[in-house]
Amino acid sequence: MSIVAFCSAKGAPGVTTLSCLVGAAWPDGRRVLVAECDPSGGDLAARFSLGARPGMTSLALALRRAGGAAGLVDRHVQRLPGGLEVLVGPPGAEAAATIDSELGQVAATLADHEADFVVDCGRLVPSATGQSELLRQARIVVLVLRPDVAAAAHGRAASARLLGSGADAQIPGAHVASAGVGAHLVVSGSGKADAREMASVIGLPLLACVPADPAAAAVACGEPGSARRFERSALVSAARDLAARIAAELSSARASIQAGSRSLGEGGTGTGSGTGTGTGTGSGTGTGTGSGSGTGAVRSVREQVIA
């Protein structure tokens, strides 16, 4: 299905936590897995007392031996206490570096799988070639930044890399454009910078603002807390809205691609292409509305993450 990659440009704006919350809030009827592919190493195994294997390391080794096969993925999945399916990353940068060369094959395998994948790519690292390949394979890339001037400066450089411009660009702009949706900005936490101004400076459309909510974030990381307060928290509400928006954009992009394929198969010309675009827009609007109105029925985020 589709890969949605979350990444950051500086610091720790909560990419792992947000990835898990978005995965837990994914619209009903669509299977989703969260995959940790942070070059600095994974956190989920330590947070939830899981083993490092099965996970990304064992999947990478299996693909190295057997080649790409989407059916291999499910053998390396673990579940958080509440049931959210995850591919845990290896602990630490040194361990993560040992599978970096396999991440391109991992990305292709995830893209062929029947589920959607929310991938925690961590902080952007130019030397991490596997991370770059994952971002190339993603249909949506979400850059998560805190609202401050320093983050905006780093975000501008990251945007140039994501869009394939600038001296250090490693992700071709042609890929981002052909992905159907592209790159977006999410501003997370509290700070002095205005989110819309940051988006303008960075050059990415603002997808969402996620409020600072340390208490809810702690619960999402496995610490004890009130289930009722967590479910009603601003952080969970923002994650649900973000999941619905992303899912709607994916549905719209898929509809456009399918309509375009039908037009080409029927020998359609410019008119056929126009019909395809119309179908994509209609589907996107309908799906977005449906997802938004149905978020109340989404299984408890806390239930999926921490039981």
Task: Give the ranges of each region predicted by the language model.
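Walker A/P-loop phosphate-binding motif and the immediately C-terminal alpha-helix
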Residues: S2-S40, L44-R47, L110
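Hydrophobic beta-strand segments of well-ordered beta-sheets in folded domains
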Residues: I3-V4, V32, L84, F117, ...
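P-loop/Walker-type NTP enzyme "switch/lid" segment
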Residues: C7, C37-D112, A218-C221
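Helical mechanochemical/support elements of P-loop NTPase systems and associated helical scaffolds
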Residues: A25, S40, E102-L103, A150-H154, ...
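Short, hinge-like loop/turn segments at secondary-structure boundaries
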Residues: L50-P54, R161-L162, V201, P224-R228
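Conserved catalytic-core segment of NTP-binding enzymes
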Residues: Q105, D112-A212, A218
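C-terminal lobe/tail of nucleotide-utilizing enzymes
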Residues: A167-G276, G286-A307
